[in-house]
Swiss-Prot record:
Name of the gene: hemC
Metabolic or biological pathway, per its Swiss-Prot or TrEMBL entry: Porphyrin-containing compound metabolism; protoporphyrin-IX biosynthesis; coproporphyrinogen-III from 5-aminolevulinate: step 2/4
Known EC number: 2.5.1.61
Further information: The porphobilinogen subunits are added to the dipyrromethane group.
Recorded GO MF terms: hydroxymethylbilane synthase activity
Species of origin: Campylobacter lari (strain RM2100 / D67 / ATCC BAA-1060)
Protein name (record): Porphobilinogen deaminase
Disulphide bond pairs: none
GO cellular component, one term: cytoplasm
Length: 308
């Protein structure tokens, strides 16, 4: 059987799609798998911060359209870029084993966030990262930084920034740790990641035979953790364009959950942390979101949107 994977054309997206292609080929020798590259709206509009472009599916819509036209069968996404709702005819078929979820500090000159001088220029487009950076270091000059991983690293090396912040998963997948002098992972209590960070989401057409082939890609722990995180985002009705962080981490038969919402300038922050029994995961994200809504989370996010 022939399978066509729709993919973005960035180095990281191609790595992720090749990784899934190889996993499928190892398990199913009868599959012939090829990749079809696309540029998404999020890849093309690099002049504006993501929050200002707005809308859901900035990195997924063109791939979904390809599947709906019948030009491809599945797409591999960074799950954090995937909206909670899918077009009719498409499903989230599998969630891969998670890479490390942490954000990372990268610099050619300073070994950590604390080592940065007052007013240092730090590059990130994420409002979630901006908020948490300013909570840790209110004196920093946070500057918007768009583009793929390699172009961001080039800007760092060209001394446009004193440091930049990236998801550690992407750096590790592309083997880039040794290219930068200082790479330091943030602790989860310092910087709560985006929902589903470090996981790959495999979206496909709703076809029984194809879904059967894709079952081998599923990771139970990643499913449980990202279920909590995506339910939290869904209940809050937040996307990647607002300052929300949520992380669920399985520890034996327990799950540790951290969540944060706030304003981009860190002037208001609501933060929660709790431990639950693993068996109670199904409603955990929704319940935590409702607790935070009762404490004013929705009003904070509405105010955050007005600041963008």
């Amino acid at each position: 059987m022939q399978l066509i994977i729709a993919t973005r054309k960035s180095q990281l997206a191609l790595w992720q799609s090749e990784y899934i292609k190889n996993k499928l080929s190892q398990t199913h020798s009868d599959l012939e798998i090829s990749l079809e590259g696309f540029k998404t709206k999020g890849d093309v509009l690099l002049d504006s911060p993501l929050a200002k472009i707005g809308g859901k599916g900035l990195f997924t819509k063109e791939l979904e359209e390809s599947m709906l036209r019948g030009d491809s069968h599945l797409a591999v996404h960074s799950l954090k870029d995937v909206p909670s709702f899918f077009p009719k005819g498409l499903v989230l078929a599998a969630i891969s084993k998670r890479e490390e979820v942490n954000d990372a500090f990268l610099s050619e000159y300073y070994e950590s966030l604390n080592a940065l001088p007052k007013g240092a220029k730090v590059g990130t487009t994420s409002l979630r990262r901006r908020m948490q950076l300013l909570a840790l270091r209110p004196d920093l000059n946070i500057i918007s930084l768009r583009g793929n991983i390699n172009s961001r690293l080039e800007k760092l090396k060209a001394k446009e920034f004193d440091a930049i912040i990236l998801a550690f998963a992407g750096i590790k997948r592309l083997g880039l740790e040794k290219q930068i002098k200082f790479v330091k992972k943030f602790e989860l209590d310092e910087m709560i990641p985006a929902a589903s960070q470090g996981a790959l989401g495999i979206e496909s057409i709703d076809d029984k035979q194809i879904l059967k082939y894709l079952e081998c890609l599923n990771d139970k722990n990643a499913f449980v953790e990202t279920h909590i995180e995506r339910d939290f985002i869904k209940t809050l009705e937040g996307g990647c364009q607002v300052p929300i962080g949520i992380n669920a981490k399985i520890i034996d038969e327990k799950i540790e959950i951290r969540a944060i919402v706030g304003l981009p300038d860190a002037s208001k922050i609501l933060k929660e942390k709790r431990m639950i029994d693993k068996q109670d995961y199904a409603k955990a994200g929704e319940l935590l979101a409702k607790e935070m809504i009762a404490k004013g989370a929705k009003e904070i996010l509405k105010e955050a949107e007005s600041m963008i």
